[in-house]
């Protein structure tokens, strides 16, 4: 069975946002605080498609104060 990397990416970021109790609106505010300006539509599209860059992923993790990510497969 082939790995669906887009689905894994989407799941990874959504899990971390859920753990931090942060929705898209709050994420957008927090991203702006670190100098990253995104729209709701842009954030939702990137996350739901699972096609965001690793830079975007790191920015999101910084915005929710997540310093360590463990990927298990």
Regions found by a protein language model. Name each.
Residues 33-51:
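Recognition helix of helix-turn-helix/homeodomain-like DNA-binding domains
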Residues 1-26, 30:
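A short, Lys/Arg-rich alpha-helix, primarily the initiator
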Residues 3, 72-73:
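Short acidic DE-rich linear segments
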Residues 53-70:
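DNA major-groove recognition helix of helix-turn-helix/homeodomain DNA-binding modules
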Residues 30, 34, 63:
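Residues within the alpha-helical elements of helix-turn-helix
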């Amino acid at each position: 069975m082939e790995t669906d990397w887009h689905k894994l990416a989407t799941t990874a970021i959504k899990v971390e946002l859920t753990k931090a109790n942060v929705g898209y609106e709050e994420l957008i505010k927090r991203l702006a605080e670190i100098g990253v300006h995104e729209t709701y539509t842009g954030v939702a599209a990137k996350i739901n498609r699972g096609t965001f860059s690793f830079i975007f992923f790191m920015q999101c993790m910084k915005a929710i104060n997540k310093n360590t990510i463990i990927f298990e497969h």
